[in-house]
UniProtKB/Swiss-Prot annotation:
Compartment(s) of residence: Cell inner membrane
Membrane topology of this protein: Peripheral membrane protein
KW Isomerase (keyword) present: no
Complex formation: F-type ATPases have 2 components, CF(1) - the catalytic core - and CF(0) - the membrane proton channel. CF(1) has five subunits: alpha(3), beta(3), gamma(1), delta(1), epsilon(1). CF(0) has three main subunits: a, b and c.
One MF term in the entry's GO annotations: proton-transporting ATP synthase activity, rotational mechanism
One cellular component term from this protein's GO annotations in UniProt: proton-transporting ATP synthase complex
Keyword annotations of the record: ATP synthesis, Cell inner membrane, Cell membrane, CF(1), Hydrogen ion transport, Ion transport, Membrane, Transport
Name of the protein in question: ATP synthase epsilon chain
Main localization, broad class: membrane
Family designation: Belongs to the ATPase epsilon chain family.
Record-linked InterPro entries: ATP_synth_F1_dsu/esu, ATP_synth_F1_dsu/esu_N, ATPsynth_dsu/esu_N
One Pfam family here: ATP-synt_DE_N
Organism listed in the record: Cereibacter sphaeroides (strain ATCC 17025 / ATH 2.4.3) (Rhodobacter sphaeroides)
Role description: Produces ATP from ADP in the presence of a proton gradient across the membrane.
Length: 132
């Protein structure tokens, strides 16, 4: 049986999850990654996407809009800008996320435009992967 690591997911509003997980799939800015027990210490930024954690009651999935993940051999702590359990994710919530991303594109300075457009594209991909 695979070992576990402590998984914690928090947003500024609340703690969404805290349990022992066998693996956590993270939508990293530089590419998706999977954290498991024994992982090398890493800090990564998140892009909008679906975070999945395999726990005692099966896979739990959360839509995140960005943030940070700190991973070590025994735990992963995710601080998400915004996060919603996939089963609570609605078209209205996704519309709000996309509207905020569009607003950021419209006000971005030239040097920040590429990052803002990438975030918007990730939000649109999040909508597609969530089936809304």
């Amino acid at each position: 049986m695979a070992g576990t690591l402590q998984f914690d997911l928090v947003s500024p509003e609340r703690r969404l999850a805290s349990f022992a997980a066998t693996e956590v799939q993270v939508p990293g800015t530089d590419g998706d990654m999977t954290a498991m027990e024994g992982h090398a210490p890493t800090i990564t930024t998140l892009r909008p996407g679906i975070l999945r954690a395999q726990g005692p009651s099966g896979v739990q999935a959360y839509a995140v809009t960005g943030g940070f993940a700190e991973i070590n051999a025994t735990s992963i702590s995710v601080l998400a800008e915004k996060a919603v359990a996939v089963e609570e994710l609605t078209g209205t919530v996704l519309d709000e996320f996309i509207a905020e991303a569009r607003e950021l594109v419209s006000v971005a300075l030239p040097e920040d435009k590429d990052m803002a457009e990438r975030t918007l594209n990730d939000m649109l991909a999040l909508r597609a992967s969530a089936g809304h």
